[in-house]
Amino acid sequence: MKTLQNNFVEAIGNTPLFKLKAASEITGCNIYGKAEYLNPGGSVKDRAALALIRDAEEKKLISKGGTIVEGTAGNTGIGLCLLGNSIGYKTIIVMNDNQTQEKKDLLRNIGADLRLVPPKPYKDENNFVKYAGRLADELKSSNNHGVVWANQFDNTANSKGHYETTGPEIWEQTDGKIDGFVCSSGTGGAIAGVSYTHLTLPTVCRV
């Protein structure tokens, strides 16, 4: 395994599987956890952040010096900001003002321009996600290098990133011997992407 990486981007992914001993013994199955906390930003959301940025770059929506805007409760914002620092983008994170002080401090400490808004239901135009999209539109005319709204909740690049990385990694690490996949869901990117990977492979994997 390559352990020396040239930059933050290269350190994302290829996380190990480790056997969950107690769960395996109780069920009589081999149950493994994928150590996504070993991504450099500390969570699986680094994968989504990278996929969202690469998608914007491929579509020529942003170049070095540009700005990424996102509404997030934490981990995706951390990934976007750390990647932005590494690649050369400014990051504006829109977050509900009732989030923990630790999250706010962490995002500010890694360089995010943090915009706090009052909590609103999704149908409200000032919901943090919709606020982020509107802010990105407002800023586009002021930056020649591009301003993009990452939009992790609706951007299919999120699930595509997992289809191209997380799913194949699990397949290779288990030599294709996988009967089931369990995943919590926030945006749905990880579970959708990994599920689609296994639909395209010669296996019967319950999700």
Q: How does the language model describe each region?
A:
Residues M1-L199, R206:
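PLP-dependent amino-acid enzyme catalytic core
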